[in-house]
A protein has these predicted regions:
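Aromatic-lined carbohydrate-binding/catalytic grooves of carbohydrate-active enzymes
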Residues: 70-108
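Pro/Thr/Ser/Gly-rich low-complexity, intrinsically disordered linker/stalk tracts
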Residues: 358-402, 454-468
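Aromatic-lined carbohydrate-recognition surfaces of secreted/lumenal glycan-active proteins
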Residues: 126-138, 191-192, 210-256, 301-305, ...
């Protein structure tokens, strides 16, 4: 075991004592993902599309899910598009899955994958096409029947069907399938799931040969996808524990031996950009194995999957602290996090989503750049001849550039620090203009261009912007240590609820009326904030303050 683990075990002892701990400064780059499961409509869709009304209902369901994810600063959606040799899009290779129309093989009347890509990109999120590789559903199901009719090797185990990984044609087939998605859709990633031998499979070859068979599929997919669009991220979801460690056993359930998934070797060989190990475990079955993944990442991205479903009392007995401790440790290890499944996160089971919103991912984050493929920064954008216009209580910014994406930063100080994630207000923005609320105080804006690989340009920095008309004087509030003093006239007034908002109007914290005239700033990141109060006449801006570290 490397030295990192020795320090890690000492560190985790401290972490274990208290789950409610501050997460420190948020990282600017980090994968924050969810698995959006479509099999049986587990996460989506929740209704069938037979008519135009049914189509709109399905679309509305997805829009609401994505709105919640955007609000929680999730930046990656892993959408299941190959389910059981069936699809969530029109394909010349495989039939429609029945989750969308209710009838296997029948179109729902629109393209769910294309719609999801468009909606994710509108919200600054990546969409990765989740491809279930080996399972083909029931032996007599439409997916397995289609594979057999097309001459593919399908193995029957009981009533279930599986694509045979030991036949070279299987690798070619999956490679062609993924190439079709990469060619026809603006996906940001191809995500391989169940890229392993099934547990029920009687292995008649050596483990070394079995691992070579699975690696052949991975290598083929990587080659085919990168030949079409080299910026598409190829990832997989291996079993959560890679192999036995010197001090900790995997108890027979690991990627390398049980699943014949040499995923760390794929990272080292450079045929995998990201891995999402399914780490649905606790304690010593989680922490040392997470550190092992990071130690053997070879500069690629590791995003442990968290068992959010165990928070549901019908599925497990986990408490919120079981997940929050894991989130905290992953943040310290510079790893991302992914929730399985989406619904357990968006439904805020045991308060997970609200906790993540407030303490973990309060600010947006960019995903890590594909630096092993490109490191050259793109050209910076430039302001238009009239870079800003003030219209009532709105400021419209406009710029010009050649990159597919822009990242927007806002601050009360100049130049805007683009290394500080707290200044990020929009990521993967695709338009050349942005409307900001005019808060009656000068603000500063920075815009960077970003290419397909995630490389950022140098920042285009702005001048300060003055409101269009003089407003009432806003008091500067007293902030001492980690408490904000509420003015006496306010604390004695009819304000029952308070909010802290950032410089662009986003709500950072909400409070009930303080009993002693002070509002706690514990866990509030350092920065500039407005204090708002709610009376019978609505929300009122009560003052401004700057919360900073005191020596």
């Amino acid at each position: 075991m490397k030295r990192l683990l020795s320090f890690f075990f000492l560190f985790i002892t401290v972490v274990w004592v208290n789950a409610q701990m501050p997460f420190g400064l948020p990282p600017k780059r980090e994968v924050r993902a969810v698995w959006l499961t479509t099999i049986g409509g587990l996460d989506w869709p929740h209704s069938y599309a037979h008519t135009s009304q049914g189509i709109e209902k399905q679309k509305k369901e997805l829009e609401e899910i994505l709105d919640n994810l955007q609000e929680s600063n999730i930046n990656t959606v892993l959408m299941q598009v190959r389910i059981r040799a069936t699809t969530a899009f029109p394909s010349s290779m495989e039939p429609w899955d029945g989750a969308f129309s209710g009838i296997p093989g029948r179109s729902p009347g629109y393209n769910p994958l294309a719609f999801a890509i468009s909606e994710c990109h509108k919200r600054g999120m990546e969409l990765h096409a989740w491809v279930v590789v080996i399972p083909a559903g029931k032996w007599n199901g439409i997916g397995a029947r289609t594979l057999r009719a097309n001459g593919l090797p399908v193995k029957r185990i009981g009533n279930d069907a599986f694509l045979d990984p030991e036949r070279p044609i299987s690798a070619s087939y999956i490679g062609s399938f993924c190439k079709q998605i990469a060619r026809d859709y603006d996906v940001d990633g191809i995500h391989l799931d169940y890229i392993r031998y099934p547990e029920q499979w009687r292995l008649r070859v050596s483990h070394e040969q079995a691992r070579a068979n699975i690696t052949r599929i991975v290598r083929t997919v990587y080659r085919e996808v990168k030949a079409v669009k080299p910026w598409i991220k190829v990832s997989c979801a291996p079993i959560g524990k890679y192999s036995d460690l010197s001090r900790y056993s995997s108890y027979g359930w690991n990627a390398y031996t049980k699943g014949n998934q040499p995923a760390q070797q794929w990272l080292e060989e450079g045929i995998m950009d990201q891995v999402y190990p399914m780490m649905y475990f606790q304690g010593n079955q989680f922490y040392p194995f997470a550190a092992d993944w990071q130690e053997n990442s070879f500069g690629r991205t590791v995003v442990p999957g968290l068992g959010a479903y165990f928070l549901d009392p019908s599925l497990g007995s986990w408490q919120l602290g079981d997940i929050t401790r894991q989130l905290y440790v992953l943040r310290q290890l510079n790893m991302g996090h992914a929730y399985f499944r989406c619904s357990f996160f968006t439904h805020n089971v045991k308060g997970l989503r609200l906790y993540a919103n407030d303490f973990v991912d309060a600010y947006p984050a960019l995903t890590p750049a594909l630096t092993w493929q490109s490191t050259e920064p793109p050209h910076s954008p430039a302001w238009t001849e009239k870079p800003h216009e003030v219209n009532g209580n709105r400021i419209m910014m406009s710029w010009k550039g050649t990159t597919p994406y822009y990242n927007i930063y806002v601050s009360c100080s100049s130049p805007v620090d683009i290394a500080d994630a707290r200044n990020l207000v929009a990521v993967r923005y695709t338009r050349n203009e942005l409307i900001l609320p005019d808060k009656g105080q000068p603000i500063y804006v920075a815009v960077t261009g970003m290419d397909r690989y995630g490389n950022e340009s140098k920042a285009l920095q702005s001048m300060d912007y003055v409101p269009s008309q003089e407003g009432p004087t806003v008091p500067l509030l007293l902030c001492k240590a980690d408490e904000l003093k509420v003015p006496q006239c306010v604390s004695e007034g009819d304000f029952k609820y308070f909010q802290l908002r950032n410089v662009v109007g986003g709500v950072v914290r909400s409070y009930i009326k303080p009993s002693k005239g002070y509002i706690s700033l514990a866990y509030v990141p350092y920065g500039a904030y407005w204090l708002y109060g709610l009376s019978k006449k609505g929300w009122h801006r009560l003052g401004v303050f700057y919360y900073k570290k005191t020596l």
